[in-house]
Amino acid sequence: MDVKSYMQTLGRQAREASRAIARADTEQKNRALLTMAAAIRRDAARLLAANAQDMEHARAAGYDAALLDRLQLSEKTVAGMAEGLEQIAALPDPVGEIDGLKFRPSGIQVGKMRVPLGVIGIIYEARPNVTADAAALCLKSGNAAILRGGSEALRCNQAVAACVREGLEAAGLPAAVVQVVETTDRAAVGELITMKDYVDVIVPRGGKGLIERITGEARVPVIKHLHGNCHVYVDDRADLAKAVKIVENAKTQRYGTCNTTESLLVARAVAAAALPQIGAMLAGKGVEMRGCPESLAILQAAGVPADKLRPAVESDWYEEYLGPIIAVKVVDDLDAAMIHINTHGSQHTDAIVTEDYGRARRFLREVDSASVVVNASTRFADGFEYGLGAEIGISTDKIHARGPVGLEGLTSQKWVVLGDGHVRA
C-alpha cells in the first residue's frame, strides 16, 4: 500500500464530508448516534470476541499491564460505550449557538457563533472505546474525523467502526464523516499529522512517546496532554477519614489512567497522624511508597512493611507510574504544596483535602492545572463525570480547550455581525 496516497485520499474525503456534517441538523446527527448505540448493543458479543483476539495478541507481544488494562473490554464497558453515545445524543448541540450578542453604538449587533473545527485527526493506543467516543463527539459537534487506533486494538476498532458506519448510513450522512485508518503502518501517523490542507486539528491519546513524537512533528494544531502526574495534598486541617478514603480511590481504583494520583503530599503538622493510616491502607493494597526521608521515617515507625517502602529520588516527583507505586512527601504547608505541584506536576489534575474554606479557595486559584479538586478523588477528572458525555481527550495546554474535551472543545467561534443597511461612518 502507498501510505501517502492512501492518507491523502482519506483527507480529501474527510474534507468533503466535513461540509456535509457541518450543515447537518441536530435531529439527523442524533439519529446517527442512536443507531450506532443500538448497533453496539446488538453486536456486543462480536465486539467482545474481537477484543479477546486483540488481548491474546497483545499478551503474546509482551505489552505491559497498563496497556492491557486500557485495551480490555467487558460487557459493562461495551454497555458503557452505547450509553455514552446515547448521552451525547441527549446533549445540547453547540453548533450554531450565538453568545454575547450585543448592540454597538453604531447600531450593529455583534456576537460569536459556535462552529465546527472541520476535520479532526485522532491518534490513540489501545482503548477501543475511543473509536465510539471520538466518532460520536466529532459527529455531534459537526466535524469529520479520521481515526487512527493502535495496531493492538485493530480487530475491535474495526468492529466498532462497522457500527459507526451503520449509524451514518441510517441518518443519510456520508460514510467519510468518520473514517478509520485500516493500515497499521506507522507512516500513516506521520502523514496524518502533516496534512495541513485536509486536517484542522490532531488529538493524540496514548503514551508519552507517542505524544512527544506528534507534538514535535505535527504541522497542524494539537490538543494534548503529555502525562498525568496527579497529586493529592493532605492539609493539616483535613478530615483524616476523608483523606484515607480519597487517597485510596485516587491511587488504587485503577492504575493505568491519566487521572490516577501518582504523588501524595502531606502537611508536616498532620504527617505523624495521617501517614500511618494512609501507609497501612496503601501497603494493604500492594502499593509501593517512594518517600522523602521524613515520610519514610514515619511510615517505618508505624510498621509499614519494609518491602513497600523505598527512598524517593528526584525523578519520582515527576513520574507517571501507571502502576502500584506512589511518591510520598512531607511538606511544610499549603504554600509548599502548591509550589511542589506547580513545579513537578503535569498540569492535569490535583486535589486538596481540607476543611478550611480559605485554603481550599487558594488551592483552586493558585494551582495551575486543568482540573483542581477539593475533598474528592482525582479520578473524577473525566468527561463522563463532568457531564460532557464522553470525552475526546484531556488538554493540559492553555488553549480554548483545557481539561476534559467534550463537544464545546471541538468547536471554535466566529464573529457574526448583524445590521440593517448599516455602513461605517
From Swiss-Prot:
Domain of life of the organism encoding this protein: Bacteria
Protein name in UniProt: Gamma-glutamyl phosphate reductase
One GO molecular-function entry: glutamate-5-semialdehyde dehydrogenase activity
Pathway info: Amino-acid biosynthesis; L-proline biosynthesis; L-glutamate 5-semialdehyde from L-glutamate: step 2/2
Keyword terms, alphabetized: Amino-acid biosynthesis, Cytoplasm, NADP, Oxidoreductase, Proline biosynthesis
The keyword Cytoplasm belongs to this UniProt entry's keyword annotation: yes
A GO CC term assigned to this protein in UniProt: cytoplasm
GO biological process: L-proline biosynthetic process
